[in-house]
């Protein structure tokens, strides 16, 4: 091969190699562009890890859950049809109470990011139960927890998390700005009621599916306040009770009927010498029963029951097994307010079964400690103090606090009756303990017609925390 042929051969080989290399580079560029386009499309739809998004489309809930696995966002989607929580069934027959949840929020909060809260309560849809709570805009064991014994501040918000979980920034959902609140589900969406503002002019903001739908202005300009537990829904309408006026004298009380977040009717109770605060309400056979707190002059609990047209009856639980705190020792009851130790009070609940009543109360007669459930077979109408069942929930040596009712509808449980349940707040910190903060955890129980056990399920946190020393 002469020199010219060698040059031509080498040139040809180089040209072939160059063309192959160019084709490989073009293929690589195309591959990168296609891969980038696919990733960009997925990222446009995805949200951060473990975040749930609910989209409402033509009366169908689309429940979307995003799970982050090795930096790849996978979207799973399940359509869930909405229902109407009828509330027409009767309360389930029960013989005792089975423990349902315990969040251990204070114990976990000594080392983890847990909200400073008070007034927790539970409410259930046809799909899930959630714990609602009023935060103080602060975390446990942090400087902003100082002074959180205060009830009403602009930093308080209503938030919620899955039942049984400690309330933290990582699992909680903002609901409303509020220092007094209620929430419930009608089978289609969550209704939240959050009261905030000055004592002499607070406003309740109603939200339905997270959107503001109505407001209620304080009508007596004296600390408008509501239940601190779930509202009650029947046949697509939800009902709540609000108070406006003195905490130690005659106040004004209204029942509100709400549909899809808008007030459609209200009635003011004609209730002289009655005092209603922080009512615990539940549906039973298509009507609503609320058992409340008398902070004026009763150591037994007032009640109001009403139908869907807001036609109501009022009274006091007659039993000599008194349900408020402070209270006298059990004795002879009254179907009106029992005056001894009647001033002040604590949020509580009871469940009516015919002439009988399940009474939840603190074990102590003068401090917020201990908790027990008592069945008085004649206590709704009879004034004696005889009872047939007592179930221990929290020992008298451990702190308790507010308590309230919630229910699980047949659409959730699959049984043909409404299951009665209750929660107990376990308050820790100020004013009884040497801390700079006040907060609480919670436990809950549901009624069953099978074996149960009495025990003590206390908060269990060891105080003080590092921030308190």
UniProtKB/Swiss-Prot annotation:
Top EC category: hydrolase
Region described as Hypervariable stalk region: 36-90
TM regions (residue ranges): 7-27
Record's comment on post-translational modification: N-glycosylated.
Recorded topology in the membrane: Single-pass type II membrane protein
Region of interest (Involved in apical transport and lipid raft association), ranges: 11-33
Location of region: Head of neuraminidase: 91-469
BP-aspect Gene Ontology terms: carbohydrate metabolic process; viral budding from plasma membrane
UniProt binding sites for substrate: 118, 152, 277-278, 293, 368
Glycosylation sites recorded in the entry for this protein: 50, 58, 63, 68, 88, 146, 235, 386
E.C. number: 3.2.1.18
Disulfide-bond pairs as recorded: 92-417, 124-129, 184-231, 233-238, 279-292, 281-290, 318-335, 421-446
Gene Ontology molecular-function annotations: exo-alpha-sialidase activity; metal ion binding
Chain ranges on the Intravirion side, renumbered to this chain: 1-6
Keyword tRNA-binding: no
Active site residues per record: 151 (proton donor/acceptor), 402 (nucleophile)
Catalysed reactions, as listed in the record: Hydrolysis of alpha-(2->3)-, alpha-(2->6)-, alpha-(2->8)- glycosidic linkages of terminal sialic acid residues in oligosaccharides, glycoproteins, glycolipids, colominic acid and synthetic substrates
Cofactor(s) the protein needs: Ca(2+)
Keyword Methyltransferase: no
This protein's UniProt keywords: Calcium, Disulfide bond, Glycoprotein, Glycosidase, Host cell membrane, Host membrane, Hydrolase, Membrane, Metal-binding, Signal-anchor, Transmembrane, Transmembrane helix, Virion
Role played: Catalyzes the removal of terminal sialic acid residues from viral and cellular glycoconjugates. Cleaves off the terminal sialic acids on the glycosylated HA during virus budding to facilitate virus release. Additionally helps virus spread through the circulation by further removing sialic acids from the cell surface. These cleavages prevent self-aggregation and ensure the efficient spread of the progeny virus from cell to cell. Otherwise, infection would be limited to one round of replication.
Assembly mode: Homotetramer.
Family: Belongs to the glycosyl hydrolase 34 family.
Protein's UniProt name: Neuraminidase
Taxon lineage: Viruses, Riboviria, Orthornavirae, Negarnaviricota, Polyploviricotina
Gene that encodes the chain: NA
